[in-house]
């Protein structure tokens, strides 16, 4: 039985809020040359096989001041106290938070946000970090059951997968595939001990 999903305005508004923060960012789908691995034998005829697709960085014209002004405008519209400064970390230039109550379709909303960011700016690489294996499996299921629904709306499908250190071909496809890609990973994978966990940070012959 196929599930039917209704379009909810508050979910669309949440996705639009994220998109509006970056208004002025051009639509681009840049490529780069992927790492061929230390065992690769150079062959000038197969460069295309090593083409990767990445998200275009935020253009310099969108300064922190402009981003904060956009964020504050959205916060005021939604009756949220405006932030005095942007939240950021060493690994994340902009930390934008959308708070939603349980059971109102948070996963649906951020999948829709991915589609909207791709539609407006060409961004196609997304990593979803979840706090537990149980939630990870639930997110994966949500991608499955909403796939046809979003494909009908946007005319394309997200390629999604669960990170597994023993299936590195999935990571390779994540980089080399030009469509929208989402990697689902639980936070413990970054903090775990052992050989498999360390593979996240290793340079491997396969690449």
Task: Give short role names for the model-derived ranges.
Residues 1-207:
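RecA-like P-loop NTPase motor core of helicase/translocase proteins
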């Amino acid at each position: 039985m196929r599930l039917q999903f209704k379009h909810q305005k508050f979910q669309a508004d949440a996705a639009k809020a994220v998109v509006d923060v970056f208004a002025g960012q051009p639509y681009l789908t840049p490529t780069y040359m992927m790492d061929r691995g230390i065992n690769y034998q150079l062959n000038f005829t197969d460069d295309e096989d090593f083409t990767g697709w990445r998200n275009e960085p935020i253009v310099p014209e969108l300064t922190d001041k402009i981003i904060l002004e956009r964020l504050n405008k959205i916060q005021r519209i939604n009756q949220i106290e405006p932030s005095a400064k942007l939240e950021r970390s060493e690994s994340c230039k902009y930390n934008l938070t959308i708070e939603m109550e349980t059971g109102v379709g948070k996963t649906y909303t951020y999948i829709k946000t991915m589609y909207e960011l791709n539609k407006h700016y060409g961004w196609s690489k997304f990593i979803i970090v979840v706090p537990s294996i149980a939630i990870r499996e639930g997110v994966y299921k949500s991608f499955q059951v909403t796939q046809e629904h979003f494909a009908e709306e946007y005319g394309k499908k997200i390629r999604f997968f669960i990170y597994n250190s023993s299936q590195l071909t999935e990571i390779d496809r994540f980089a080399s595939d030009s469509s929208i890609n989402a990697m689902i990973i639980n936070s413990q994978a970054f903090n775990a001990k052992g050989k498999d966990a360390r593979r996240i940070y290793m340079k491997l012959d396969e690449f």
